[in-house]
Structure formats: structure tokens, C-alpha cells
From Swiss-Prot:
The keyword Ribosomal protein does not apply. It holds the Pfam family SMC_ScpA. The lineage of its organism: Bacteria, Bacillati, Bacillota, Bacilli, Bacillales. Its main location: cytoplasm. Keywords: Cell cycle, Cell division, Chromosome partition, Cytoplasm. It comes from Listeria innocua serovar 6a (strain ATCC BAA-680 / CLIP 11262). This is Segregation and condensation protein A.
């Protein structure tokens, strides 16, 4: 027979079962009728055993705890002479159990509240961010100064990324291209954009390593001639190439 830990009526453990029994009796959790609760709990465990279900050990531990508390409460009170100067309140055998039940109840209520909030949140849908670059003319955010080291770092990262994505077998064909030709190509790409602006790596798509180097040198020359500028909105953010001058009008 396949063994299984029972989970009747979605009880997650002995404390969950006890809360259910206390709720059925409609009694105060701070004044649990131990005899009645223990009898009902033991009846539940015995029923599971009769059905030949594998009762989880934690249920058996709780059964022993309940029987111990019940026994203590059934013991006759000893009649002693009372010294009112040293009188202390007698500890209730149920105190530790009540404390555990209250703590479990708080966690259960918190879990229920979180689940409700999760269900409520599922009705909300986030809208993907929009590219508003073409609308930001006149409200341009201050850019950080981009150094040659920043550009070299971005260029090296792009080279490594393209090397990882390179096919295992490639046929190399030489194609000479001048820096002037590549400068015109870069300006042409920028001219095609509404705001004359492109992300740095978009200028280097589908090029050989030699072409990448020529494009990078062309970009530096365009910056020197003040035909383009390279911008960065924040440290470690993407670099953007912004066209300038009459060539783009």
C-alpha cells in the first residue's frame, strides 16, 4: 500500500486541526476544554489509523501533548496552607499550547491577507515602457560627459559579445572600406532616425571585426569634427550617439 500523509479538509498540521476543533466547539481559545478537545483530536487520529493512512509524526506528538495537559488538569488540587506573602499565580498547563495556537493563528491570518492581495494584484497589468525619445526635443535631460575610456570600454564589451555569438565556422572575405565612407554611413543611419539619435551598439550591427574598428575610428573622427556627440544619461548606462550639424538637416 502506498503511504501518504493525510491532509483532511486541508489541515496543514496539528495546530490547524486544533483551531478547527476549537472553532467547531465555539469556545474561547484562552479557556480550552481540554477533555473534550483531546477526545475529539484522538478520535480524528484513530480514524486515520483505522483507514490505514500514514499519520504524520507531528500529529502523534501533539496527541501526546494533549493527553499530558488533560492529565495535569484532572489531578486533584492539593490543599495546602496558603502563605499570602509568597503567593504566586499557579501556571495553567494550557498556557504553552495557547501561545502556540495564537502564534499559528496570526501567521495563518497574515498568509490569508497576503494571498488576497496577490489575487487583487493579478487584475493589474503593467504596461511595457515606451520609447519617447522622438518626443523629448526641447526637454533634453542633462547628459554626463563621455570620455574616450568610456567609449573604449563599451567598444571592447561589444567585441567580446560579438565574439561569443560568432558561428563556429565562418568564411572570411576581405572588403576594404575607408574611414570617410564609414563616416558617411554613420551619418546616414543617424539621418534616418527622427531624433537623429542611435544607441552606440546599433551602429556596429552585422559587421566584421575589421569593419567594427573602422566604424569606431569613423565615430571618433565625427566627434572630433563636432558632427556627432556621444551621451550617457547615468553612470554605467548605455551610450547614445547624437547627430549634430547641417549634414543631418
Amino acid at each position: 500500500m502506498v503511504e501518504m500523509n493525510f491532509k483532511v479538509e486541508a489541515f496543514e498540521g496539528p495546530l490547524d486541526l486544533l483551531l478547527h476543533l476549537i472553532g467547531q466547539l465555539e469556545v474561547d481559545i484562552y479557556d480550552i476544554p481540554m477533555a473534550e478537545i483531546t477526545d475529539q483530536y484522538m478520535e480524528f487520529v484513530h480514524t486515520m489509523q483505522e483507514m490505514e493512512l500514514d499519520v504524520a509524526s507531528e500529529y502523534l506528538v501533539m496527541a501526546a501533548t494533549l493527553l499530558a495537559i488533560k492529565s495535569k488538569m484532572l489531578l486533584p488540587k492539593q490543599e495546602l496552607e496558603i502563605d499570602y506573602d509568597t503567593l504566586e499565580e499557579e501556571e495553567d498547563p494550557r498556557d504553552a499550547l495557547v501561545e502556540k495556537l495564537m502564534e499559528y493563528k496570526r501567521f495563518k491570518e497574515a498568509a490569508k491577507e497576503l494571498k488576497e492581495k496577490e489575487a487583487e494584484r493579478s487584475f493589474y497589468f503593467s504596461k511595457p515602457p515606451m520609447d519617447l525619445a522622438e518626443y523629448d526635443e526641447g526637454t533634453k535631460v542633462a547628459e554626463l560627459d563621455v570620455s574616450l575610456n568610456d567609449m573604449l570600454s563599451a567598444f571592447n564589451k561589444m567585441l567580446r559579445r560579438k565574439k561569443l555569438n560568432k558561428p563556429l565556422h565562418t568564411r572570411i572575405t576581405t572588403q576594404e572600406i575607408s574611414i570617410d565612407d564609414r563616416m558617411n554611413s554613420v551619418l546616414g543611419k543617424l539621418h534616418q532616425q527622427t531624433n537623429h539619435r542611435l544607441r552606440f551598439d546599433e551602429l556596429f550591427e552585422e559587421q566584421t571585426k575589421e569593419q567594427l574598428v573602422v566604424t569606431f575610428l569613423a565615430l571618433l573622427e565625427l566627434m572630433k569634427r563636432k558632427l556627432v556627440e556621444v551621451e550617457q544619461s547615468a553612470s554605467f548606462a548605455d551610450l547614445y550617439v547624437q547627430g549634430k550639424g547641417e549634414e543631418l538637416s
